[in-house]
Amino acid sequence: MIREPFRYRETFAAILADTPAHADAAKRGMIAARQVLECYIARDPFFASTFFPYEPETDETLICHMANAAAHAGVGPMATVAGAIAAAGINAMMDAGATFGVIDNGGDIALVSDRDVRVGVHAGSAPVSDRIAFIVPPQEQHSYGICTSSATVGPSISFGMADAVTIFARDPLDADAWATAVCNRIRPDDHRVLETIDPSRVDGVYAIMGESVVSWGKVPPVVPARVDEQLIAAGDRL
């Protein structure tokens, strides 16, 4: 297995692949997706700035997919951008014949895998941060999403207070959108946002808020781990 950093404009990702050819396919897929997105935003800047669901005036598949996933979660379409770019890379890897690939796009992960994958959890100053991992079972049929949103870690805009909200979903864009939505609204004493989740779109939720941990739906096994924060894909490390 190889691990390659990838940087293109605002995308800072890490690619895990079995072969250099599969990693190269991932890079091409992510670049192509970014180019489609940038071309559309040039025509419709509001798509990039709104925090609310938005119906784009286009039939471009990527743009419509982003808007649809965001609308179901009640957030703006750019809440799905990291998941969308990562998913594009994984889909390109699969088209190139890959049965294993992981793309970490700043804490938002898309993967396809014929084996178990261990995904560590970084949650800022929370007690469990860097001490646990999920054992994600094989996901061989399509790209799978494991996306994390945080109000205390990283540069992304958040209206919440959670140290980490991780969403597991069969579509990385759904995972990304719902990570934002849940992180914005969940509180240690208020979990009502979980009642709004469509279980046909989201498999599970794992939310960390200081010493409080909330789990919903089908979450992969959680095991003790020693997580190296430096392995998280971020702009200051690539």
Swiss-Prot record:
Query: What is the protein name for this chain?
Result: UPF0280 protein Mboo_1274
The entry assigns this protein to a family as follows: Belongs to the UPF0280 family.
Residues passing through the membrane, by range = none
Alphabetized InterPro entries for the sequence:
ApbE-like_sf, MA1715-like, UPF0280
Q: Which Gene3D superfamilies match?
A: ApbE-like domains (3.10.520.10)
Looking at the record's lineage, which domain of life comes first?
Answer: Archaea
